[in-house]
Amino acid sequence: MEGKATELLAVLKNNNLAIDVKVSHLLSIKSDIKQKNVPDNAVHLIFESLRLAITSHHAALYAAGFSTFGHFLKRLFIQDQAHIVSAYARHFCPVLLERLGDHKERVRAQAAQIFTDLWPAASADVEHYVLEVALTGKNPKAKETSLIWLSNMSRNHGLLFRSYVPSVVSCLEDADSFVRHTAKSTVVELFQGAPARAKADLTKEMTAQNVRQSIVNAVYANIGLEDHSSTARPRSRVEPRYTPCTDSHPLRSASRAEVVHQQPAAVVSSAPLRPSKEATPMVEPEPIKSRPGSSKSDKGRTIAAAPEAEKAPHMETARPSSQDGEAPQPLHAETSKQVEDLFRVLSPAFEGRESEDNWRHREKYITSLRRLTYGNAPHDFPQPFFTGIKTNLDGIFKAVNSLRTTLSTNGCLLIQDLAKIGGSRIDPMVEVIMQNLIKLCGGMKKISAQNGNVSVNDVLANVTYTPRLLQHVTSACQDKNAQLRLFAAGWLKTLLNKQSHHKSSLEHGGGLALLEKSLKRGLTDANPGIREAMRGAFWTFHQMWPARGNNILSDLDNKTRHLLEKDPANPNRDQSSYLSSDTLTVPSRSALKEAIAAHKKARLAPAKTLPPRPESAQSSFSETKVSDPPAKSTGRTARAPLSSLSSAPMRPGAKPRRPELARPATADPYSSRKTAATDAVHIDSSPRPRRVANLGQAPSSTKSKPKKLDIPMTMAVDPVAPSASNENETQVATQVASKVRKRSSLSEQFAAIKRDDRDINALSELSINKTEHPHEIAVGESSNNEAGRHDDHAPCEISFDKLDRHDENKLSESPTPGPDHHDENALGELSINVPDRRDETALGELSINKPQRRDENALGELSINKLDRRDENTPSKSPPSEQDRRVEKTIDSAEHTSQAQRRVEESEPYFARFKIRSRLSNKRRNISPHSEHLENAKEMVRVAGQRIRSRSFDLFAYRKLQDLIHYHGEKLFTRPVFDDLLDGLLVELRKEPSPDRKHNGDYADVKTQVVGTLRLLEKSCPNLFVIDYDAIDAIFHARRYFETNSWIVQELQQTALEWFRNCEPSKLEGMLDTLVQYVQRETRDEPGYRSILMALSLLTDLIGDANKKGAWFSNEILEQVGTIAARDILAEDTDIRKKSIELCVQLYVMSTNLYQDKGVSFWRLVKAPEGGTRQLIMYYIARQ
């Protein structure tokens, strides 16, 4: 046989021989195989010969090859040489696979039979090529044959088919009708006698792959599931009743693949069986070709498949959907491998660009991912699920950014579902999600942008907060795209609501500064829609940080603030203006409109019936003479009175006469004007009771004052509880400052409200005082015109910054004669403004024509510790002479103060400008009798340092400590006690402010009291207080916690500057070296830049002072300063760069004066920067 095998191989390789010769040699060796054993040396030759025969293109030759191959395999199994079959199977399977897809059915059947013969010896290779390659391939003939082979092997050889069910089910939706028909027959055969669990798996698989309902119903009917949907359409002609594929098959005769091949029992029992797979892919592989007409029914299949999916016993009910009105049917996974298989199957569909061929598959896979998200995968198999999501995130956003609306919407819904269900588990991918969604929100397509907006809201509301999220939102708030800014207002509110119970996460890392910047820009945006949307976010911010909200509110203009306060989101808005129309009015909106129209008609009707009036009589009546009843005045908006830019009163415009205002025609037409124009000198003798009500209504025509601003209407020294006596004294001083400073817009409003709220009693009280002092009346009359100019400009504030000890010395050295011409002018101003005071006691006791003594402090009684007095609620009992001295000293101090010193920054709160300096200049401290004893005071001070370190020291305790220091001075301390107190103050100054202490006062006030106490110790205890390096470091460290626009920053800068200027020359070099080292080691972040900015400002001032005096610092200090300037001139912060330029200018002047080398040493000090930086420095030096 070896010789025949060798001859056969040579014949088959010879292309010159006829086919009949080759066939005859092949049949000859076939006869020998059937009758004799095959020797081992001939096995290889026969396998190679059969391979050449089967691959031949001649039908006679490959038919003889298939026939010979079958007998050859039987002989090898009989000889117990299955291992040889297994070894050669892997080489023969590719050849057989090609024949499995042949266009001739007979050839396909022969190839299938050879696979059946090979299976007992090489089951793994055979199943791989037939059921994993051919069944999922592109050749419909190979698919059809593979399905028939699977049915045969399952029925006759016990092949476990569970792992191949997804591939079979995918063939139910194949583009080829023969494949679909064969797949239905195969499914029916496989599951006809299957257990209930297997049928449930089949139901789930068909639902997962969206098999059309007609096919599903046909399968259910044939496998014994009687509860299939009755709504399916009738069976068509192309869908006959299905019978097993071995019984009948249309359009072809039975093939050899359907012949039952009986193997010997020993061979079958010894054949290795392949274990079944547990994992079942839930999505079919990408089809080759879409079935015609199936695209329009994709959604219909999903909806129709839902009732069938509900039959599965383990299926959960669907959750409510986020936006599309109906949640997708949950898809449950049995194992983690199923989840991995799903992501492996869908990945190829998202490769490359979107096209007409792949967009439907992308949409289907996105829907499958949504169903999987609503299933058990995120909870039972989170690791493979979220890993797969992260891996395919790029493909998901290809769907999100698609131009097809349905695909983009489904992608956004998937992101929303992931955010809601995944929560913090999608944190690793939230950066990519935010970048893509924000880009989507800025697009021109409204539907996609709105979907992106909702998706961003869901992501922000469910993922873990990070500062990067806030940066994304605030960046969108400042974007050029108006639509993005509009959406960002809602995102900001969502973020604030989510973090409302975790404010510290926003407060750290500069989050509050970003929030304030975004809110300010949004509230003043040019787009009204953005302003309206940002108001809701502002009031959410205001509820979390009231003090910062008030700062933002105070910086807005009147119109913006008015609209902001009237916003429905304002929890503290005044409901009085809405009481009549919203709360007390029960009828509907239409009834309200009718009532308003009727009221207007009633108002205008009498004007038509009025007879003509002579010109000598008044033709209209001023509205100031009458006032409507309170119920009416609160229910309608006050009409804006006619006015001009001048504050002088003018005749109101003509208005129709009302029936209830009829009066004699001989009435004085100028009476109202007299009342309105009456000054502090002229008082109408005829009282008008209704005038009081009208004065109370006057403010309704102006802008309503801000409700949350911590700026009082009177000059209360302590913002917590101003006393009556303080109000009287500070109001007198306020009038003196009316010519000194420029009032702010808020002061105008409060002054107008104060002025209009005065009643006639103040004028009556003034007439009594004038009777007692006739010479005062003359002075008042001489200044009548001036009063007309300044009456409306009475300021609400006065600066005490410059009333320091220098002014006190000037006042104490001045002579004390009677009133002269200078006093008359001051008294004239006071007498003009006296009627604006409401307190009768203050006016009764004020005697300004008896100045006798000027040796006391002008601000002696103006202490911010008035709150500690026991008689704070009673009128002042001081003798008239003492009040005279205070008034005269205030006038003299105000007039002797230079104009530059009188200027006050309007952006600061009203009490911040004199809180510290007024205490330093105040010599008269009222302390309790217990504290007047030195031993008792020492005991109090001894524990002060420890209490400050433990943060149990409130604002009132600081003020009490300052009173003790001022009263007792250095006698209060020993060196250990003083050092302990100083250490406690410096520790508190370095500590980061804690928001939980705000109920005791704003933490800026605490730091302010610490700074004030330090400056008081410096002035009161000069022998104990030493300005050392720790104090400088602490005051610069405190600067890190406050924004540049905070008023405490000025106090910190002024304190540090005074310490350096008052430092001994021997220690100045060391302190400058400490300052420079502090700047070098400070971190270059937002808090660090604040300290650096203050240090650079201080260095600039100190070098500037030295330049004016012609002095200079050592070369080492100048080199360090040059290093700092060169480093920070390119800093990220704009203020730092600006201040570095100023420092370079001063350093250039000092180096030029020191070295006399025309700037050569300066460029050496700043490390000789090149390019634009050098030109910039040279420009500012030249401009200087």
Swiss-Prot record:
Q: What is the lineage of its organism?
A: Eukaryota, Fungi, Dikarya, Ascomycota, Pezizomycotina
Concerning PANTHER family, the annotation shows: CLASP, CLIP-ASSOCIATING PROTEIN
Query: Which source organism does the UniProt entry give?
Result: Aspergillus oryzae (strain ATCC 42149 / RIB 40)
Q: Which stretches does UniProt call biased (Polar residues)?
A: 572-584, 723-737
Q: Which UniProt keywords apply?
A: Cell cycle, Cell division, Cytoplasm, Cytoskeleton, Microtubule, Mitosis, Nucleus, Repeat
Q: Which GO terms describe its cellular component?
A: cytoplasmic microtubule; microtubule organizing center; mitotic spindle midzone; nucleus; spindle microtubule
Which ranges are annotated Low complexity under compositional bias?
Answer: 640-649
Q: Does the keyword Ribonucleoprotein apply?
A: no
Q: Where is this region: Disordered?
A: 229-336, 564-584, 602-906
Residue ranges annotated as compositionally biased, kind Basic and acidic residues, are 229-240, 308-317, 787-811, 882-895
Of which family is this protein a member? Belongs to the CLASP family.
HEAT repeats, residue ranges: 92-130, 162-194, 463-499
The entry's function note states: Microtubule binding protein that promotes the stabilization of dynamic microtubules. Required for mitotic spindle formation.
Provide the gene name from the record.
stu1
Span of the signal peptide: none
Subunit note:
Interacts with microtubules.
Subcellular localization: Cytoplasm, Cytoskeleton; Nucleus; Cytoplasm, Cytoskeleton, Spindle
Q: According to the lineage, what is the superkingdom?
A: Eukaryota
Name of the protein in its database record: Protein stu1
Its GO biological process annotations read: astral microtubule depolymerization; cell division; mitotic spindle assembly
Main localization (coarse): cytoplasm
**GO MF terms on file?**
microtubule binding
